[in-house]
Each structure stands twice: as C-alpha cells, then as structure tokens.
Amino acid sequence: ELEPMVTWGITPAQSIRVSEKIPEINNFYEDDRPVLAKALEYMDVKEGQHIKGLPIDVAFIGSCTNSRLSDLREAAKVLKGKKVKVKTLVVPGSQDVRAQAQKEGLDKIFIEAGAEWRFAGCSMCLAMNPDRLHGTQRCVSTSNRNFMGRQGSPTGRTLLMSPASVAASAVEGKVADIRESY
C-alpha cells in the first residue's frame, strides 16, 4: 500500500510520507542545506516535526491537474456526511467536469459539507481573482506546484496533497492521513 505524500517545503521535491517527520537538513548534501533551511523558515516548520497534525487555514481542491471527475468523486467520498473546519474551495477542472459532477450530485455533497462549489477556473491555483491566501495562511492544495508566494500571498504557505487527503485535512482542520478514518 502506498502511503499518502505531502510537501513540507517550497518545491514538490520537498515532500514526505504523511506519517513522517520533517527531515533534518544535516542529512542532505551540504550544497542543498541553504535551500532547505530557507524552506523550513518560509513554511514555519521545524526539523523533526511531524507533518501530520499541522494546523491549516484553507483547503483547495482544484486546478486543471487534480480536479478531474475521478478526483472530485474521491474527495466527495471523504466529505459525505461530514463538515469542514476550514475554508474549503472545490473548483472543477473544466466546465464539462463541473456539469458531470453536478449530474452525479457531487456538488450537493461538497456544499452540505460546508465547502464552496465553484465554476471551473484557476481560482487559488493561480490566485488571479479574490481566491487567494492572506498573510501567513497555510493551505493544503491539490495544485501541482508550490513555491514562495504561491496562491497570492507573499507569505502564504502551500502544502500539496491528493484530493482525498485535502478533503480529510479540511474535515480535521489539520494535515490528516486519509487512511486513518476515511
């Protein structure tokens, strides 16, 4: 069984299994350590800290890469009958995906869980509209990249996860392991 992954840093390469602790930078090549130290500082996490349980402010299920119909179905399975604890945006990858999701009633599951059901578009992935992080908010996101300033705030922090993992984290209000109770 594959274990869910989550990014702890500012690139997709800075990722760990959800059950792991954030790595010690001294375990990396000396040339890599300054970038890793910068990532730790920016993301406001510590070496040896568990990633699971890290509080979040926002959950984003969207982007053209991770909000296919199959992704939305997986997220809906997690959210059905539950309530999110943080602001949660669900943005289908296309208008066709949105229409099919609505035919299947997925929109109702998201709305009943307390998530915002949106039209297809870039939304928080690009932050080219009001859907953006503010200040040092931490967001679990299904987008495919993270870097400093991602999602519209120069100090906002993005952790990449699968759609089901983002949904579970939204319910718990912190980084969650989808395998534990969903």
Give residue spans per PLM region.
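Fe-S-dependent hydro-lyases/dehydratases of central metabolism
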Residues: 1-182
